[in-house]
Each structure stands twice: as C-alpha cells, then as structure tokens.
C-alpha cells in the first residue's frame, strides 16, 4: 500500500473560519491521488488529465475535445450503453469536459457505489477503444455543438477574441475545433492522442466523500495495475506570444452590438494574479454593485449585460470586458469602460475601499467552497498543475496580502491603452 500524507489547513478571518482536511498519495504507476474526506453520503471522484487544446498539433485543432466525447463510446469490456447505464442505473452522474490545458472525467454517486465509479472511470479513461461506428455518429453531435456556438454571438466573440490575443499560439484556437477537422478524425487519431497523454503520470485522481482512503487506494491499484509507468511526452516548445494589439469590427448582422476589449493577463503562478482577481471582481464581477454594471446599466441604462473576466494559464493569461448594447451606443460604452479603468490607474484605493473589496471576495470564496463538486474539481486542478491542492487557507492569505499599491501597480500595467485589443460584432 502506498504511503499517504495528511494535510489539515485552518483558515481564519473576520468573515470566515474554515477547517479543511485532505490526504494525498501516489500509486506505483505514478498516478497521484487526492482525497478530501466529508460526512456526506455522496462521493465525487474523477480524473484530471494535463492535456487540452493547447497540446494539439497544427491541423488537428479540436482533437482533445473530440477524444473526450468518444471516450464514452466503448472499451474492451463495455459497450456505449453499458457505460451510460453503469452509474445512471443507480442514480449517479457521469460527465466530462475539456479546456485548453485539462481534460476531466468525473462522477457523482452514493458512497456505496464508489467501487463501481472507480472501476468505470479507469476503464473509460485508460481502456477506451474508440470504435469507428460510434465515432461516425458522435461526429455529428460535436458538429451540432460547434454550430450552436456559431449561433451565439455572445459566446463566439470570446473565442474569436482569444484567437486575436494569442494569434499564432496554440492557446488561440477554439477548443471545439472546426466541423471540417472533426469529420476527419478517426479511431487511429483518438488512439494516438490518448496514448500520448492519457497516462497515470500525467493525471491525478480526486475523490471527495465519506469513504476510507485505504480502500480507495486499493481499488485504484486494482483498476490501474496494468497501466504503463512512462511519462507523457514533453510538448514541443511553444512559439513566443505576440505582443501586437488589434481593433476589429465584424459584421454579424446581430440585433445588438457585442463588444469585447481586453489584453493579456497573468499566468496561474504569478504573484500579481490575486491583485488582478480583486480588480476584476470590483469592475465586472458577479455582484450587481460592480463598477461597470453601476456605470453602464444602473445609471445610464445602456446595457443589459456588462461583465469582466480573467483566465490564467500555465504561462500567460487573459483579461477582458464584455458588453452588449445598441449599435449607436458602442463608442459611448467603450468610453465609459475606459473611464473606470483610468480611475483604477490614477487613484489608489482607500483603505475602506480595499477592505470592502476583500470582504466581498472572501464571502464569494466561502460560498463557492460550499459547492463540494466545484471545490473538488478546483483542488484537483491545482494538485495536477501546482503539485499541491489550492485550499481555502491559501486563497484567503493571498487576498489578505494584496495592498492598495499592488492594485495600483497591476491596474497601470494591465490597463495600458496601448496594450488593449477590441473586437466588435455589429
């Protein structure tokens, strides 16, 4: 039995008092395991694999997402129907998603069905056969998914904007790929791609529930004992990110204009990231009291939706604002957005403003961590990429360390007008 490590974190602040316990271990084949105990009868578990659309070679855009879909279509011992029915027949749930750096397969079941979930997940992740007859059907499902995005300008504009920012870089292309690419993929393509990246040393297994960790490890060893111990191949070094900005207007014949303006942000491990996280929440976070919402919607009635967002990757990031408005209000809205950015660049936050921003962030973190599925996925992701689960204690400490000077410095660096790109759908 592999050795395991116990971690207990205590997170205290004026708003929150949280105790979190988790265990980690590694199997002989290199699979890392994260266990978060709870008192709930529901178990969340799955695999987080370090492969996404940024790992695709030129000409195979969409292959990572394609593999995620067809992984459910048959293994050496299960047909597609058996995979679907295995957990759903006992009220469980089986799901998956792909992003630019990860592919995740996960399940939710009552704890008495945990062995069934562990066996099924290992089977589909590591032993899928990708039968061509099933691929031929699933291809059309994926193409319909692609078309649904093309029919939604408020979603499509994010993909096109990211392609502008990361032009010529694997992070720039759409996760779904194109219908042309998807229709060209075969069983051999899926087998080649997954054999490269779906390996124990390139993944973590996470589980959250009222179960015995020793039993989890025994079940995992049994389910993965036949897997190779070789590491996933090192990706070809990526081309340097371009630093060009762009202003682009696209005629989409939409009823309203869709507008995104933004720039590169910070990588996941950047010390400046938390300051930008606080700034982003102040500007266009989920609260109705966000500065952009107050300025553009509450005071002037120019928009229904205005928001800002940020995403961090291993080596870079992205920050942007999005809004939808009447075509004749586009330039006015952009000026108002710019005014809010300038205020953050020119005026340091007062102590009261900074404390209020931190209080809001801490409350949001506490509520988000009450969602056990979200908590488990987030801790699994940080365990995969950072080598240690990112817990509440760490997040709260990072929030507390941010100063008004940090906010001012980051705002001046990120919101430089010369670094901004803009994309408009009319």
Region spans (language model):
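Active/ligand-binding-proximal structured segments within catalytic/core domains
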Residues: 30, 37-87, 161, 271-283, ...
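His/Glu-based metal-binding/catalytic segments typifying zinc-dependent metallopeptidases
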Residues: 37-41, 46-48, 231-289
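Non-catalytic terminal extensions that flank enzyme cores
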Residues: 17-32, 37
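Histidine-centered active-site/metal-ligand motif
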Residues: 65, 69, 169, 258
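Charge-rich, well-structured scaffold segments of protease-associated domains
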Residues: 21, 26, 83-232, 238, ...
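Short, Lys/Arg-enriched N-terminal segments with co-localized hydrophobic residues
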Residues: 6-19
């Amino acid at each position: 039995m592999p050795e395991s490590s116990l971690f207990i974190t205590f997170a205290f602040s004026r708003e929150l008092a949280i105790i979190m316990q988790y265990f980690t271990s590694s199997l002989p084949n290199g699979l890392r395991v994260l266990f978060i105990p709870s008192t709930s009868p529901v178990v969340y578990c799955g695999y987080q694999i370090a492969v996404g659309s940024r790992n695709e070679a030129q000409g195979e855009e969409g292959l990572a997402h394609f593999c995620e879909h067809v992984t459910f279509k048959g293994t050496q011992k299960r047909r597609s129907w058996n995979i679907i029915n295995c957990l759903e027949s006992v009220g469980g749930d089986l799901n998956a998603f792909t992003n630019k750096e990860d592919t995740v397969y996960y399940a939710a079941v009552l704890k008495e069905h945990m062995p069934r979930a562990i066996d099924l997940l290992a089977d589909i992740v590591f032993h899928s056969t990708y039968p061509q007859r099933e691929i031929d059907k699933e291809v059309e499902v994926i193409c319909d998914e692609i078309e649904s995005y093309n029919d939604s300008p408020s979603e499509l504009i994010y993909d096109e904007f990211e392609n502008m920012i990361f032009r010529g870089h694997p992070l720039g292309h759409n996760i779904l790929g194109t219908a042309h690419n998807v229709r060209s993929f075969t069983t051999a393509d899926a087998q080649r791609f997954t054999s490269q990246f779906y390996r124990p040393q390139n993944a973590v297994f996470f589980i959250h529930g009222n179960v015995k960790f020793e039993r989890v490890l025994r079940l995992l060893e049994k389910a993965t004992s036949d897997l190779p111990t070789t590491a996933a191949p090192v990706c070809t070094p990526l081309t340097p990110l371009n630093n060009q900005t762009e202003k682009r207007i696209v005629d989409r014949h939409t009823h309203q204009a869709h507008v995104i303006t933004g720039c590169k942000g910070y990588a996941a491990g950047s010390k400046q990231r938390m300051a930008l996280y606080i700034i982003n929440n102040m500007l266009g976070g989920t609260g109705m009291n966000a500065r952009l919402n107050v300025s553009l919607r509450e005071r002037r009635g120019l928009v229904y939706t205005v928001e800002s967002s940020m995403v961090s990757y291993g080596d870079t990031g992205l920050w942007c604002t999005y809004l939808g408005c009447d075509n004749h209000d586009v330039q006015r809205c952009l000026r108002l957005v710019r005014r809010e950015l300038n205020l953050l660049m020119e005026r340091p936050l007062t102590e009261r403003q900074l404390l209020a921003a931190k209080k809001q962030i801490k409350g949001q973190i506490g509520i988000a961590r009450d969602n056990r599925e979200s908590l488990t996925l987030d801790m699994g992701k940080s365990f995969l990429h950072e080598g240690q689960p990112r817990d509440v204690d760490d997040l709260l400490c990072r929030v507390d360390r941010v100063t008004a000077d940090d906010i001012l410095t980051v705002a001046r660096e990120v919101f430089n007008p010369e670094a901004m790109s803009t994309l408009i759908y009319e």
